[in-house]
Amino acid sequence: MFRNQYDGDATTWSPQGRLHQVEYALEAIKQGSATVGLVSKTHAVLVALKRNAEELSSYQKKLIRIDDHIGIAIAGLAPDARVLSNYMKQEALSSKTLFTRPIPVRRLMSKVAEKAQINTQEYGRRPYGVGFLVIGYDESGPHLLEFQPSGLVLEYLGTSMGSRSQSARTYIERNLDTFPDSSREELILSALRALRDTLSKDQELTEENVSISVIGKDEKYTLYDQNDTKEWLDKLGDKGPAAARASRAAAEEPQAPTAEAILDSADAMETD
């Protein structure tokens, strides 16, 4: 991906009007493990696939609580995520201290976007190599937003980021109309199904490699532990993409007519 003299700094434009350092930061997000976010009229959900650097190491933390009404899922460089998540926590605390109220979700993300965008304008800086999915609940209801290193923040009904995330987005696009009216349980299970589609053939969802969080009306940000995660995976049923595809194929396969159905059909064809 070497771009000659046009990728040496974030402030250097290419002749095609591109900032290659920003594009490289977006590529870092694609190297992270998949995360999925969904929102309904009452709740917002994040699920994430955790990785361990090697067999003997612990799994990397993917979901981070910012405040009682905000949480994030990260994809990309974990150290950059730590810097930005700490900044978000400070801003949330400042709002409570100065204004005695939780900071609105969009306002917090606007502050984070400004901080990230500065790194694309000043010489000697680099864009943050991490992206967020953000869920929150404030006076205007539940929210799901996506943050990108360029400083772009978009609001979604459902989305995914990270490695193999296109498979999850395909599932979300096919079922988008069902999410607004989904219950809390249905929304979590739908997010897990989308996450399951990002797995390779030899992988499956387990309580060790999956994180689940939810927020909603009269419900603070909740991050489930392994025991609770296992219960959700048991409700999901098929935990791997191969088994899920086999189940869907079996459900869609036309059934052979029974003997009673054949006899009924023959009787119906008789005429006087």
From Swiss-Prot:
Task: Region Disordered: list its residue ranges.
Answer: 243-272
Location of the protein in the cell: Cytoplasm; Nucleus
Q: In the UniProt record, does the keyword Nucleus occur?
A: yes
Q: Which organism is it from?
A: Schizosaccharomyces pombe (strain 972 / ATCC 24843)
* Composition bias, Low complexity: 243-261
> Origin, by domain of life?
Eukaryota
Q: What does this protein do?
A: The proteasome is a multicatalytic proteinase complex which is characterized by its ability to cleave peptides with Arg, Phe, Tyr, Leu, and Glu adjacent to the leaving group at neutral or slightly basic pH. The proteasome has an ATP-dependent proteolytic activity.
Print the keywords alphabetically.
Cytoplasm, Nucleus, Proteasome
Cross-referenced PROSITE patterns:
PROTEASOME_ALPHA_1, PROTEASOME_ALPHA_2
Q: Can you say what this protein is called? A: Probable proteasome subunit alpha type-6
Q: Which SMART domains match?
A: Proteasome_A_N
Which family is annotated?
Belongs to the peptidase T1A family.
One GO term of the cellular component aspect? cytosol
Q: How does it assemble?
A: The 26S proteasome consists of a 20S proteasome core and two 19S regulatory subunits. The 20S proteasome core is composed of 28 subunits that are arranged in four stacked rings, resulting in a barrel-shaped structure. The two end rings are each formed by seven alpha subunits, and the two central rings are each formed by seven beta subunits. The catalytic chamber with the active sites is on the inside of the barrel.
BP GO terms, sorted: proteasome-mediated ubiquitin-dependent protein catabolic process
